[in-house]
Structure formats: C-alpha cells, structure tokens
Amino acid sequence: MTTPLMGVMPTSLRATLQNCSRGNQQEGLFSPKAMGRMAGQKDSTKPRDEVFHPHAAKDSLLATTLRWPVLSQQLSPPQTVPYVAWSGNIKDPSPYMKGCSLPMWSPCLDTKDVDSSVSSGRMSGSSGGHESCTLSHGPWKERPPLILGPQRQPRKSDPRLEQLRDKIRAQAQWQASCASLGTSAPSSASCLYKTSTMLWRKTPKVTNALPVPAFPGSGVLRTAEHRGKDRASLSLRRELSKVPQHHTSVPRTNFKKVKNASCKREISKSSILRRTAKGRGSDRKAAAVKASPAHTWLCKPMSAHSDQQVSKHTPSLAFQDQSATIHGAMETLQDLRQQIQAGLELTRSPRVDRKLSLSKPKPQNLVGKRDRGLQSTQDMQGSSKTAWTVTEGKNSSLHRAGNLHSQQHRKKALAEHESCPRRTWTGQGQDSSFPRPGSTPEKPRFFSQRPWSALARQTYPQRTWDAQGQDISVQKSGSSLKKPSPFSQRPWSALAGRAYSACEDREVFEPSPWNSLSRPHSALQDPWSNSFVQRSSPSSKGKSAVPPPSKVKPAWPEPSQDLLQSKPAKEQDTPCPRPRGSLGQQHSSESLRDFMRQKAQARRQQALEQKALAAHTLELRNQRLQEVYRKQREAVLGKDIPVVSQRRPGIVTFVPMQSGGMEAPGSLGSPREQTWSKVTSGMVLGDQEAPDSFCLCLNKPWNRIETQDTGRPLEGYKQARLQALETMAEALRQRVDILTTKLDKPTSPDTSGDLASDVLPLCPSTAPATPTLVPPSYLRTLMSKGGRESPRDLVDSQAEPLLLSTCFQDGEMLPWSPSWELPNPNLGTHIESQPQGPVSSTPASVSQVIPHTQSCPAGSSSHGALSKEAIQGLEKKLQREMATLQALGACMKSSLGMPDAPDPTRGSLWQEEMPEVKKEGLVTPWTTRSCGKGEPADRPWAGWSGGQGGLPWASSTA
C-alpha cells in the first residue's frame, strides 16, 4: 500500500517514512490502544514538553506530499537543520489531546494499511518510540473533537506498549538527572545505553527534511497552543534540576557511550544557540495566533513558511536550552554524590575524619582570603554557579558549552575513581582564590578545602612542578627556600611517576575551572606557584608539612576531583594521604647517634654505680665481720684461757674472788676477803686415785708486759700457767706433808670427836665426816723427788690435776649464798675431792667443808674424837694454806691483768648447772657451750666469758 504514496513523495520524505515505518505501529487515533494511551496520560504527573502532535505532523506530511512537494524540498535542506535535533528524552505523547476542541483533519485513508510517522523531538528520542499512523484511501474528512472531561478508560495491557513506555521512562530518567528525575520506574543501564545508541544512529536520517503541514495554520496553531506548556514544563525541569538529589543513584558503567553521545550534541550547539532569540520571538507570534482561530486560516503561504520554520526549529532550541540545564544539574548531582560518598568514607576512617575536621577553615578567614585572591584565579574559575550549580539560563552559551565540554573529562574517570574522598567547589562559592604572595598565612588549613589535595603530586606531570620551581624569584626575601625544585624533596615524589602516564593524553585541556593549573608557562599567575612562594615564607614555619632536609616547608594544596581520576585502582581503598604536621623538633642522624650513645653511657654508669654500691655494702659488712673476728681473736689470743686439760676436758675450775682490791703477788691477804666461784665443770676420768674429782686451777693473771719479750701471747699464757702450777704445787706439797703427819699420828677419841663436832655444824649433813687429802700421783712423785722437777715437767703432767679430797654425806649440798662470810676466822677452806660418785660443783667457803654424796674413804674415822690440840693444829695449817693460796691467786691475777672478780650472784654458770646436778646426780660433761651459756660471742673460749679481759661473770652480767 505504500508504493503509490512513495511514488509521489520526494526522496527525503520517502527515506523519512521508510525509517519511521520501522517503529512500533499504532492502529489509529481512535483505536483501543490509542484511546487507552490518551486516557492513561491523564494520570501522569510528569511534565510534558511536547510541541508537535503526531497527527499534526501527519497532516503536515500529507499536505507537503500532495500539494507542495517542491516547497517541502526547499524547506528541508540538510545544512539548515542540525542533525542533533531530536532529544534523547523519551516522553509519552502530549497530554494536549485530552482537551483539544479544534477540528483535526486527517486523510481518508485506511488506518490499517500503510504506517508512517513523524517523530517530535519532545515526544520521542529513539527510532523505536514513534507514533505510527496508517494512511487511509479516500476523501478528506473532519475528525470529531476529542472528548473533554475527567472520564478515564481502563488501560489495556499490551506487551509492546508497555515496553515502549519503559523505554520512554528510561530515556526521561537519564536525560533529566541520571537519578530518576520525574520518573518512578528505575531504568537499567543496558536499556538506557542501547536506546541512546539507536537514537544517534538514526537521527541524521530523520532530520534531513521536515515537511510543511497540509494546512499551514494548523501547525502554527498547535505549536502556539502548547508553547506555554513547554515553557512551564521547562521551568519546572529547571527547578527540579536545582534540587540536590542525595538519594539517587547514578549509573556508573559504560560512561564512554555517554561521553560519545554528549560530544555529538556539542558540535551543533553553537548554531542552535544562535537561533534562541528568533525562537523566542516566534513563540510570542504563536501565542498571538492562538488568540484568534480565524486568523489561522487566513495566513499567507509565506507566513506559513516562516511559522513552519519556527515550528521546525523551536523543539531543537528548547531542547538545547533544557539539555544544557539538565547536564549542569547532572554534573551537580554527581558532585554532590561524590561528596556524600567521601563523607561516608571519612566516617569509616575516623583518623582521616579528624584530620579533615582540624583542617576546616573559619568563615572569616575564608572571606579575608577571598578578598586577597588573585584576579587570574577568578578568571580561571569563571562563574562557579554556572559550572557547578544549576542556573536559570542567563549565563553565556559559550561559557556553558565550555563547561559542558570540560565536564566530559570528569565523566570519563568517574567510573574508575568513585571511592576516593574528594572535595568539590560546591558550597564554597569564590573560595578558590589563593592568598597573595606577600600575605601571611595565618591558618595553613585553608588549603584543606581546595578542589585539589595532596594527591595532585601524584597526578600532574612533573613538568608542571618543574615550571613551578622557576617561580622562586617571586618569593619574599625572608623566605628560607634553598632548593628550587620542591617536587624532588617531597615524600610522595615517588608516586608522581605512576600518574604521569595517565596524564600524557591530556596535553591540551579545554577551558575549565582549573585550566590555569595545566599551563606551566603561566608562572606568575599560577596559584600553585603563588601558594608555593607564600608557603615558603618564614611565618609559615612550624605550621606546614614535614620539612625536607633542606628545611623547606611548603604546604601543597589538594588536587581537584578530575586530578584524582588518574590514581591507580589499587590505591582507592586507602584514604588520600595528606601532609602531616611537624611532630616536634627535627634531629639529624648525628644528634640521634649522640643521644643514643649518651643513653647507653648513662645506663652503663648507672649499672656501675649499682655495682659499686653493692660492693661498698659488702665491704662494710665484711669490715664489721672482720672487726668482730679481730676482737674475738684478740680476746682468744690476748686473754688468758682457763686451764683445761685436752685429754680430760671435764675439769672444774675455781677462781678466787675477793670483795676488795687485789693484793700484790706474794702477799698474804685476809682469809675473810677470799671466796670462790665456779667457772666451768665437767667429768674427769682422773687417775686411779681420783677417777671423778675436782681440780682447783689457780688462775694467775697474765701479764702482758712480761710476755712482750716472747712475742707470742701463747707463750705468755704458758708461762703464767707454769707459774701457777709451780706455786700451787709448792703450797699443796707443804699442806700434804703437814696433814699426812697429823693423820699418821694416833689420835684420841676426844680429839677426833672435837674435830668432828667442829666440822659437823658447818655442814647440813648429819653424818660426820673427816676431811682427808689425797695427793695425786704427780704430786706424790714431785714430793718424792724433793721438788727437783722443772716447770716443763709440770706442763707435761697437766693431765694430772690436783686432787683435794674430803668426805661428805650423800644428798648434802651447800646452797648458793650471795655473801660468803666466814663465821669462824680460825677455820680454813677445805676443798676436798672424792674418788667415786657424783661431784658437787658448789663453791666452798674458807671456813666451810663442802659435803659430797659419798662417804669418806677408808682410813678416816668419822666418829673418832679429836683433841683440841689436833683441832688447833689443823686450823693453823689451814690458815697457812689459805695464805699461800691467796698469794698464788694475787700473783696469777696480776700477771694476767684480770680485774677484780664481781659478786657471784650477778652471773655464774653454777646456777645453770645446779639443777642438772640435782636431777642426774652426775657431773655434766664439759663442753665448749658450758663456758658461758647464752653469750657465745663474748665467750669464745672455755672457762672464760666475754672478751673484756675479765672473768666470766664480769661480761655476762654487767
């Protein structure tokens, strides 16, 4: 059915109809699908920007084909209409069909045979979204007017129609704001880019020629009728594009197709914008035509021709105006989305968030720095509101075109760097101005909100930085810059080589807000150079980044979002590094080594001091011990040791004790002043005569002066001992001789009885006892030899103690008395020894007889009477013996230098050993401990106590 029509149509229209026939078909205006579409359009709340009605386009097409074929060829040359005349914004048919009351003419053709369509730029942007109308064969007839009213027919579900609606919604969603502006159904990326690709492939064929409508007035009428609606919808879209879409999602894939599509639009944008004024004037004329319907039919063909040109170009002009606005809104939304994503990433990394919060400048500082900004940077950024915020179309078209063209670089890299935190120029206004070179940077954190951060060192080529190194001549004379190239001194210089290859293809930059940054030759007006010079001043020291070894402390600003795009993908996870502040005073390697050496030396010195202190403490302790040991040695070696037999250690020693002063050696003292005290005791085996006996050791003091010639204290001790033994032996020999002669004489019972009566009252025992003297073997030998033995022989016979025997009754013991007063001055001291039985360690008085536990040996008569003469003789003998013993004791003490013996009650071992004698009935074996119990330090030897040179009771009780 299309063959007869094609034969009449021009070539351009034939191509147009053939292209249009490939779209979706529609059965007619009043078909169920068309009525459903028109009824469903009443529910739509989306703004409609349609200019042409498909039936009006159909009428124009038929009129051009049948009546003015030549005119249609003249009106549609390829060079007059730009090939980008069709909007990518796919919309449903115009809602004006709901209330149009004007008659609409259509050819009397069958609505089901031939399909042809003319797409309006406002209604469809793809080849698949055309409204098809089938030509009917027959005369022209007038269509009934559309029914006005709120009645609504139910929409029938058609899969193809629904698919077409989805495509239209997807196109509208992408064109409006790429974030579902004015649409409710989300669109997939595949459908979006497939539709846009088909659009640009088929647009040149469609836009080659546009026919003039059959009735000239009808096209102008319908154009003027919906011009106000287009303006209202355009303003509404502008207002919607100004609203920041924080909750929308921008498609992040296949941005190269978007870039290519946008580039095709930019080519003919200048020619389109030149007709903006003409299009607006035609709008006014169309509005006037709408007021008088009769004037529509009286229009001349020339006016119809001009109106047709207006109707042909007006959709493109309006679309370009809206497209620029939409692109600006889309870029603003993308920037806002990047800011939101950067905020989320900063929230996930608290450490970077703290750095950003610390680096935010104060408003007053920003205002002051804006006033001091360079004019070149103001020219560089142009109008921030035009580039980054939605405007009302009042800015120049050239600036808008330059901004849109520069934004293509941003689209290309958005898919690669979505995760890196950025800062945009939105919300900062004219904050992009840098301080002047002579200004003092009070707040170094002013650069923290620049569109470029510290990562610009990784993205810009090195030649830009080298060119900045030549700006040192601009800096002030007080700056401390030493090296011209700061790029080699920065810690991130190694990373700049990575991004250099990514910037190789950007040799020529289009006009953009940061275009001056890409020109290394603009040294004096380069904000990088200005900031570098200003940052190099001494006033910024201590506040800028970590200085290099040359003490240069330049604080570099941050790169823009475009510059961040060349960062490798593997570095996206980590937050953008920024120059850290100075952590403190910087030290060189030599100073650090000196410090470490000083610390090590201090530690060694402390260890040495601790060792020295420990050694000193040990030395003091050793000195104290040595002092104690020395005193002990002096006490042992320098003092007299009691005569104790090494063979028979159980020797009981009695030392004479005086109540008065010591008498000179050899002088006889008063018997009343002499007492005895026990020093030590032990078990003595003795000889056959006295297996258990007492030994009286006359302790002659050792004279130090006399022993100086020998040089050894031990020799002096031996000399004193020998002297005491000789004196005692002589005295005992005389006494033994006298007593032996007395006892050998026959005594009468009276004498013996008197003697016993004199002796018994002095003893607590009831059994009388007769004292007898049993000389030991060595004394008998000495006496038999006539005293011809030398003192050396007496030393060898030290194991043979002197034995003084007397007989006491069993169980009798003389208690200790504090004072040993002599009741009878005529009585002497009887120190007796008993051959058998336990030994009593009780001291005896001079006038007392010490009782023992055994009876007297044979040969002594206990019940014999003694005459008075015998008693007197015994008394005289005892007195002589006491005088001799006293002289011997004085001699011993004077030679040994011993002080006067203290009172025996103040301390004596007799009290300690008295209970043992009572319990066991035996003499306690001699030990070293028995020589002064409780004071081992003061009694280092047996028999004596204390190292003071005195007797045992002097030190133990004093």
UniProtKB/Swiss-Prot annotation:
Protein name: Coiled-coil domain-containing protein 187
Encoding gene (name): Ccdc187
Alphabetic keyword roster: Coiled coil
Disordered: region residues: 116-160, 345-447, 470-492, 510-602, 916-958
Biased composition (Low complexity): 116-132, 536-545
Highest taxon in the source lineage: Eukaryota
Signal sequence annotation: none
Organism lineage string: Eukaryota, Metazoa, Chordata, Craniata, Vertebrata
Coiled-coil parts of chain: 718-743
GO biological process entries: microtubule anchoring
InterPro entries: CEP350/CC187
Compositional bias segments (type: Polar residues): 374-398, 470-491
Entry keyword Coiled coil: yes
GO CC annotations on file: centrosome
Molecular functions per Gene Ontology: microtubule binding
